[in-house]
Each structure stands twice: as C-alpha cells, then as structure tokens.
C-alpha cells in the first residue's frame, strides 16, 4: 500500500494544526462573571468537617483510602470548624450532641454546606423508635443541602452527593446566597412522648437520718449529741 505525499504528511505530523500561543489580545481574554469565578474556585476546594457518631462514618473512612480517593474533588478534611465550609454528619444525632453540633455549624464561615449521611442522621433511623434521646432528622437543627439515604450508604453514594453539591455550588449567586432558606425537609415521624413525673425528687434528702446523726451512732463515735436527741428517751431492749 502506497500513501500519497499529503496522506503521509498527515500521519507523520498529526498535530500540525494544533493551537499555539499567540500575542493577539482576543485570544488571551476570558469573559466570565464574579459569581462563576467564585463558584469555580469554591467547588474545587471544599474542606469538610467530619462529624461521625456511628457506623456510617466507617463507610466514609473507606472513601479516604486510595480505592475511591476523594482528594480528586479537592476535599481536604479539617479539624477546626473555622477552617471548614462543609459539614458531613454521619450517624445518630442525640439530644446530648445537639448543642455541640449547632455550635460547630455556627462557627463555620459563610458560605457553608451540610451533607446528611445515613438514615439515622436523616430520620433518626432504628434508634428513634420509642427513644426520647435520638433526634429524628438533623434538619430540625441545621439546614441540609444534600441527603444520602442508606444504612449505611456506600462510598459511591457519597461521591454522588459531592458531585450534586458541586453542581449546586456552581449555580449559586453571591447576592442571593444570604436570602436562600431551606423549604423542604425529609419526612420523619414526630415524637409521641408521654410526660411522667420525675423519679429523682430529692425526698430522700429530707429524712430524719439525713438531717441529723442518730443518737446511738453519735454516742458510739464520741460526737456531741444535740439537745433534741438528748430529749428522746432511750429504748430499752429486752433480751429475754
């Protein structure tokens, strides 16, 4: 098979018409907006704050490994909320965790985003059945941007949630960001708790033995006996 000179030249030099750097002004200008530039830099450098409280965090730990490699999305875990802009809640949220979680969210700088990972975080999961301590939905405390259902969700689902969050950030606007509020919540069952009287009422502190040492014990250890105890007649014990 004999190739013509033109065909041979195309095969030998396939990048003959490749773009080159020119000095023309029109070829070195990029037209964009401040929102697009800001969102492009933001979605490529998300710094998450990991708030793992249960088994869902084990699946997230697998995401950090080399098999899934979430560093390709620019995710750099931070240990301080003041350096993070993404809060990932993984696991059951209890009433005792509530003040800590809200404080961490308030310490994060704007703009900040939240990913709710797992059924326990979204609706309370199996721990919310007849439990007065489990919070049925973290969106009752802080606004949530992306939900990841599952018990627990796989690392691929977390990657999909990060991609969806990046698309949401790409459409954000600096002027409208402070006005946006969460309008929809994940469905969850409300708490139906019965109010009962407290068990620890403090009545045991008002017994006579707590107010004063018994007369027999005071005499045995050599303590001074109060006049009120001295007025009590000593009981005679019959031994036979």
Swiss-Prot record:
GO cellular component: plasma membrane-derived thylakoid membrane; respiratory chain complex I
Enzyme Commission (EC) number: 7.1.1.-
Compartmental location: Cellular thylakoid membrane
Cofactor notes: Binds 1 [4Fe-4S] cluster.
Entry binding sites for [4Fe-4S] cluster: 55-56, 120, 151
Any one Pfam family match given in the protein's UniProt record, by short name: Oxidored_q6
Cofactors demanded by this protein: [4Fe-4S] cluster
MF terms (GO), sorted A to Z: 4 iron, 4 sulfur cluster binding; iron ion binding; NADH dehydrogenase (ubiquinone) activity; quinone binding
Catalytic activity: a plastoquinone + NADH + (n+1) H(+)(in) = a plastoquinol + NAD(+) + n H(+)(out); a plastoquinone + NADPH + (n+1) H(+)(in) = a plastoquinol + NADP(+) + n H(+)(out)
InterPro entries linked: NADH_UbQ_OxRdtase-like_20kDa (IPR006137), NADH_UQ_OxRdtase_20Kd_su (IPR006138)
Domain of life where this protein originates: Bacteria
Keywords: 4Fe-4S, Iron, Iron-sulfur, Membrane, Metal-binding, NAD, NADP, Plastoquinone, Quinone, Thylakoid, Translocase, Transport
Membrane topology: Peripheral membrane protein
Metal-binding listed as a keyword: yes
Described function: NDH-1 shuttles electrons from an unknown electron donor, via FMN and iron-sulfur (Fe-S) centers, to quinones in the respiratory and/or the photosynthetic chain. The immediate electron acceptor for the enzyme in this species is believed to be plastoquinone. Couples the redox reaction to proton translocation, and thus conserves the redox energy in a proton gradient. Cyanobacterial NDH-1 also plays a role in inorganic carbon-concentration.
UniProt record similarity statement: Belongs to the complex I 20 kDa subunit family.
Name listed for the protein in its UniProt record: NAD(P)H-quinone oxidoreductase subunit K
UniProt organism field: Trichodesmium erythraeum (strain IMS101)
